[in-house]
Amino acid sequence: MRRPFSLLAGALLAGALTVSAVPAASAADGDDGFTIKDPRIKESSGLAASRQHPGVYWTHNDSGYGPQIYAVDGRTGETVATVTLSGIGTPRDVEAISIGPDDQIYVGDIGDNRGGTWPYVWIYRLPEPKELKDQTIRATQYVVKYENGARDAESMVVHPKTGRVYIIDKNEDGGHLYEGPAELSASGTNIFRPIAPVDLWATDAALSPDGEHLAVRGYFGGIHYDWNGGRIKRAGRLQVPLQAQGESLTYSADGSKLLYGSEGADSPVVAYDAPGAGKKGTAPSSRDGSGAAGSGAGGSGGLGAGTLAAAVVAVVAVLGLGRLLRRRR
């Protein structure tokens, strides 16, 4: 995945504010945040809550790694199963994971490090194992193309009721929600067509367990939508934690939480109440116009005014240095 210089500023900011920005985990159900402890998981780029195994979350590495997904215990942060996918080619740039009907896991090999020039990408589907142990499971591979040409993407969701797959492309100026065919075909090419704009540089997305709400995150903000049969309607902004490389998002299995993950070793997964959860003492979202995403107002991950001001100065300084270096080239 490409990492623009401006993201470096965000990484420095997130690193400086990790203690302030990450709310403490307290519950024992694994849905209140954790730290991924497995040293093999250095670029967690997708997250999905297990439906068969309460408190367990599936994740995977980004590009340059093998065909493995990992089951992580949300109570301890420890890996409890490593699943190797067989029956597929060499993964290229895996960016997303989602669970559909009948406990089917979908893995999105949909990233494009060449900036949207690969003529096709892939989706892999496999059954979620009933037993959590290291094992190899045969997966089905689907070829995906976009109706309006190749593009980079990091967000894929599967509707929990219909099983239809959707992708959001990654564009700094905003992307689109792409709808796949009613059923994916393993024997032909699956064409995804744009059906709605998404006003965000999207790095991941998640559908609520009831299929009624779509949450989309970027590096520094997020939006939640009413699903509306895929003709999404913007409902408000999401509070997104400041993270070094925030590229994963999932609802908890009961839909009460949104969990935000990041790339990096020992990366934290931060939990906020999902829109409408109504938990006291948090501010997971705001209606449009009522506040900025990530403001932290009223939440355990909130930032003090002095800390935020210092952080802004640091970001401006880093961006200024970047411009100076570019002029000297």
Question: Which role fits each region the language model picked out?
Answer:
Residues 2-10, 14-18, 23-329:
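Sequence/structural signature of beta-propeller domains
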